[in-house]
Amino acid sequence: MIVLVDGHKHHYEMECLTMMFFPGEKITTTTDLSQQDGDYLYTRLREGEGIGQLFVRASVGGTSAEEGMEIPLDAPDYDRQCERGFGRMVYRLLSAATGRAPKWGILTGIRPIKLFHQCVADGMTEEEIRQLFTQEMLLSPGKLDLAIQTQKNEQKVLSRSTRDSFSLYISIPFC
């Protein structure tokens, strides 16, 4: 599978997300747009006239599908919105093409609970968090419930921390 990146810097996120749909396969990321043979994922960002235009085409097994969306250039967190917009489109297209639906949605390369803690710190309600993570991040209901419960349990522990406390994160691969 080739991931073609055109006009944006989200190559790492696109590659990681693509790997979830093609486990064990070699994923090559390139800006060489001539490599649209065989299976590929083409992602493009064009900016102009106050709008960022995102476009994704997935060609898998001889069948192609595409999606696009627009984001105002002055949108809050424009870069993050582009990253997540690309992620949602890639997820939907590759899910339809492969029949896979990764339960953690578009979340790659980050501990999900870290995002949940940030949402709580920003004053979001549990309902707002649920909406964000199901609609924007495409988490499955089971993983969403697990993450919310984990965040609540972790917050109980963190609330007892003192100034001289520290956190130790141990990465345990589970792929």
Provide a role label for each language-model segment.
Residues 175:
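Conserved, mostly hydrophobic/aromatic
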Residues 1-96, 100-103:
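A short, structured N-terminal alpha-helical element that caps or precedes a catalytic domain
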Residues 98-101, 121-168:
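N-terminal [4Fe-4S]-dependent radical SAM core
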